[in-house]
């Protein structure tokens, strides 16, 4: 049978760019699930001023979700889940204009 590959849980070669299109600053967290059998966990927290971008370097492999909170009127938004493959050197760009608002206390 196939032997499960261990995830790259330390610094990878790829990066994730988070673009903030909002007219307000955002606070956010980068959540990763390294493997099907592991619990998702926050590995980075960040702050991005209005209309700015931030590049998170040396991201590991796994399934990711970005969760943000707008800071003028607190509303939470979450990205679709996306995957960074093992040994990826790619830059993933995520524009934080996701459609479905969440109550802040359910996300943060």
What are these regions (language model features)?
Residues 53-55, 88:
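Alpha-helical interaction segments
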Residues 47-53:
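Short, solvent-exposed loop/turn segments in extracellular or other extracytoplasmic domains
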